[in-house]
Amino acid sequence: MELKIQNITKRYRDKTAVDDVSITLTPGVWGLLGANGAGKTTLMRMLAGILRPSSGRILCDGVEIGTLGAAYREKLGYLPQEFGFYPEFTVQDYLEYMAALKGLPRTEAARQIDTLLERVSLTEVRRKKIIKLSGGMKRRVGIAQALLNDPEILILDEPTAGLDPGERVRFRNLLSEFAQERIVLISTHIVSDVEYIAAENAVMKAGKIIAQDTTEGLVKQIEAKVWQGNIPMEQLSRWEYRLRVVNLRNEPDGTVTLRYLADAPQLPDSVPAQPRLEDLYLWLFPEEMEEAK
């Protein structure tokens, strides 16, 4: 199984949402990282066959997805950022409806729904109306519908939005298990969602893929740019605005330990810190750190 994206561009009048993107996806979990507005959702909608590219091609095992048509859709599971449902639908109603749209026989659909509801911990609310569920529960319903047809290609746009930490861990484990011999693409700006389960990550910015590698390979790009230093509490506000602080920790002696990004050490007695994928993300998207100040 191979999904090849060749020089894909998507334009809306005077705006280019996706700009000449090329990447080849093979079985395993792939992370698609980027800030809001980077072009991730537009790219995923093209991969799902919802949008047509302005130029470029998407090939599934060497054949354009437009040519494959229904045969491609049968291989596909897709969870958009926002998914619609009829207000009167219960969880069971919705999954049965989606299974019918995907062409699953009733007996197979019933078996698959039972299995997936258990996997996403929704068995007890299967008769409850979706409109009355919490945001996290609705997201889990969406995840279940994306898995109904046991897809070979799974495209998930911000799948963990609204999930609590325990649900996110269970979801990551489910995806790792599911990704055997399947392509799973996860779009997110929550780096921890993909840091430990993605075989490779691609980073999008302003419609372009600006970096692509394994987690280890990407993290190497930020080596010697992550530092840790200790300051008195009364100096915190001054340094917080001068540095790109990733996080801080209050110490028992009244000082503060800062983890920060810089080309060279800025604080007295700073030492190099072990880089993480989140550090690379914040290095590439400094505007997100500025917004938090």
Question: Where do the protein language model's features map onto the residues?
Answer:
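Conserved ABC transporter NBD signature motif
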Residues: 56-67, 71-72
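ABC transporter nucleotide-binding domain
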Residues: 170-258
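Catalytic Walker B motif of ABC-type/P-loop ATPase nucleotide-binding domains
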Residues: 154-158
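Helix-to-loop junction immediately C-terminal to a conserved catalytic motif
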Residues: 48
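Walker A (P-loop) phosphate-binding loop of ABC-type ATPase nucleotide-binding domains
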Residues: 35-39
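Conserved ABC ATPase "signature" region
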Residues: 96, 100, 107-125
